[in-house]
Amino acid sequence: MGPVMLDVASYELDAEEREILKHPLVGGLILFSRNFHDAEQLRELVRQIRAASHERLVVAVDQEGGRVQRFRDGFTRLPAAQYFAAINDAATAAQLAQEAGWLMAAEMMAMDIDISFAPVLDIGHVSAAIGERSFHSDPQQARIMAECFIRGMHSAGMKTTGKHFPGHGAVTADSHKETPHDNRPLAEIRTHDMVIFRELIQRKLLDAIMPAHVIYTEADARPASGSAYWLQEILRQELGFEGIIFSDDLSMEGAAIMGSYAERGQASLDAGCDMILVCNNRQGAVSVLDNLSPIKADQLTRLYHSGQFDRQTLMASSRWQQANKALTALSERWDAHKQTLGQ
């Protein structure tokens, strides 16, 4: 298995994509909204992906909830992470967050999708890229909700990915469009943003971590996604993280400072990433495959899902029906609240 995760263009594979998926450096594929028409089509696309590759790929998606939910029609409308903080009763909020993690994971695994890149562990809501994707502005409250969501995912059989290390929540710039700079003192980042990562790593609840395309100017001139300081010295050595490290999408503008696509990919792997994402640019992806040194990343097999869910049986279960009803209601209440605020 190779260290590169790619994407595909539409509802089914074309001939070029079938050949690319056989490349020895390819180890994963991420799905987007453009790959989804309905549940039956999606399941068939995943079957095609499995059949095209020589080895079982890690199939992934961003199915967080709120505005970042790639599959909608026929799937539960998942609330964004911030919504759980609006529930007045802490026990109810914790239970519903856990059910959200379970339900999201179960619905994805019924499609034979291995992982959803979740949960978001960024603190606060000021970032344009993060906003309501964050559980809370208080690190401990965010950790409590994230841990519940994680336990739900694990109970279903899906591995977790905490993002975006060491924290994207305090920068207003969107790393999809530019390279954000976080100029805060390193001590503040350590005692505020990194707390949630540290505590969840200590509890061995994070199977993978995705670093931010953010430059933390007090620490390094490179984005964290391409920084050996953040990935090796801090994440591996200081925090003792033993799981998988993903890059975020190297086609994002926040990664452009690292050079060409091939240079971005090599820099991220050299810095300590186990798998790099190259999406939304076929030419860039091919350049990475053509120029990367041969490398195996067999540790990525740890990310395969271990749950078995039949979609019809899942949706007929009382647990799914109750969770679906509660989560949909929470999303609708939050939408009504935002409308009163003119958002």
Curated annotation (Swiss-Prot):
It comes from the Bacteria. Gene3D superfamilies: Glycoside hydrolase, family 3, N-terminal domain (3.20.20.300). Its EC number is 3.2.1.52. Pathway: Cell wall biogenesis; peptidoglycan recycling. GO terms for cellular component: cytosol. GO terms for biological process: carbohydrate metabolic process; cell division; cell wall organization; peptidoglycan biosynthetic process; peptidoglycan turnover; regulation of cell shape. HAMAP family: NagZ. This is Beta-hexosaminidase. It comes from Yersinia pestis.
